[in-house]
Amino acid sequence: MTKFKRRPPVILVNGLAEQSESWNTNRPDWSKHFDIKVPELLVYNGDALHKHIESGGEVSIPYLAERLGVFLDEFVQKPPYHFVGSSLGCQVILTYAVANPEKVGKIVLLAPSGFHGDENLPVIEGVSRANYGTLVGSVFYKKYFANDDLIAAYEKKFKDRKWKKGVLKTLRGTVGHSVADLLEQVPHQTLVIWGADDKVLSDVPGSIRAADRMIRARQVVIPKCGHAPQIEKSRLINGLVSKYLRDKLTTIPPQIDATRWLKHAGANVPVKV
């Protein structure tokens, strides 16, 4: 009889302006080796979020980290968990990891916010000016990712008053939040991946230096990439993440090594993807 080998759980946590669909190009590849879970922490028109809002609750990073913990305890129950997060989702993961170190395996952070400096949040302009093309386009290095279908999808969402209220409440509770004071407290092996041309983060070099305070961090910078590496460079990201979580990423290719990138003052270095 063939012995069944349980796949380790990997939890995907998306960012502020993203939904679970943002992982569509990654999940099939990672599912070959891992049990992928995607908690819906930010369903902006969902009853759970609005019940919390109507009771006077704030939609904050600690609140989202608490919701993540409830999801894991009730529906996964197989620690330790590996985590892959994007943007704001990285703050949620680190908040959970510092509070529950024994339940966390490895961590991968994609374009994490809240490490250093300000953020240029296109979602605010999308809400205030109904400029959905700007909202979507500013996230990516190459504008063809901001196609008409994606722009139309956001336009439809923002016309839903309940969805828009959920976004606004989340913005008020999370904009400007920092996890800089947590970085030195993270004991886990962590891979941090940045887009060299990220226009959402105001200071990528400063953020890289801040991430160096994590005692077990390895860092990568991807040229010609914006704030959504998992979408823009999905093939490269899929390989890096899969190898890292399986202890097979022995070396960082020099073309994407963060230390080398900093020495070149952020100059783009060609990389085969």
Give residue spans per PLM region.
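Active-site loop/oxyanion-hole signature of alpha/beta-hydrolase fold enzymes
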Residues: 37-84, 239
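Catalytic active-site module of serine/aspartate enzymes centered on a nucleophile-bearing elbow/loop
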Residues: 217-273
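Conserved alpha/beta-hydrolase catalytic His-Asp/Glu region
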Residues: 127-188
